[in-house]
Regions:
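Short, glycine-/small-residue-rich phosphate/pyrophosphate-handling segment
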Residues: 103-135
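N-terminal beta1-alpha1-beta2 submodule of the flavodoxin-like/Rossmannoid cofactor-binding fold
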Residues: 1-104
Length: 135
C-alpha cells in the first residue's frame, strides 16, 4: 500500500499536523504540504468554447505526486464547516484536471483510490465536520 498525506493547513506543526502524525505513526507515507506550493484558484471554463487554459503554478506537480499512490489521507483544519481554503483550491482544480490531456483517465483513476480524512476542529467538531464528510 502506497500512501500520500495531503496537508491542507497553513500552520507549521499545528493541530492538524500533530493529529495526523499520530494517525500515520509507523506508516511509510509521502507527505505533501500544500502550503509549500503555489496553487491558483480555479478559473472555471468548463462550459466555454475554449475550455480551460494552462495555469502557471505548482498544481500539476502535486497531482502527479498524489496519483502515484493508491491511498490518500487528506488532513485539514475545519473552517466554517468545511476544509481549509488551501485544500479547497487544490480539490476545486480537479475539475480542470478531468479535462486535461496530461492526465487521461484522471476521474477513472481516482475511483480506484482509497481516501481518508483527518479533520481537526475546535468547538463541536463532530457537528461542524459533518458537512465536509457528507460532500
Amino acid at each position: 500500500m502506497s500512501i500520500a498525506v495531503i496537508y491542507g493547513s497553513t500552520r507549521i506543526n499545528g493541530n492538524t499536523e500533530q493529529l495526523t502524525e499520530h494517525v500515520i505513526k509507523g506508516l511509510e507515507v509521502e507527505k505533501i504540504f500544500l502550503r509549500d506550493f503555489l496553487i491558483q484558484p480555479i478559473d472555471d471554463r468548463r462550459h466555454t468554447e475554449g475550455g480551460f487554459t494552462d495555469v502557471d503554478d505548482d498544481y500539476s506537480e502535486l497531482v502527479e505526486r498524489m496519483m502515484k499512490h493508491d491511498t490518500f489521507i487528506f488532513a485539514t483544519p475545519l473552517y466554517w464547516y468545511s476544509m481549509s481554503g488551501t485544500m479547497k483550491n487544490f480539490i476545486d482544480r480537479w475539475s480542470h484536471t478531468m479535462r486535461d490531456e496530461k492526465f487521461p483517465d484522471f476521474k477513472k483513476q481516482l475511483g480506484t483510490k482509497k481516501a481518508y480524512v483527518v479533520a481537526v476542529g475546535g468547538d463541536n467538531p463532530y457537528l461542524k465536520g459533518l458537512p465536509l464528510i457528507q460532500q
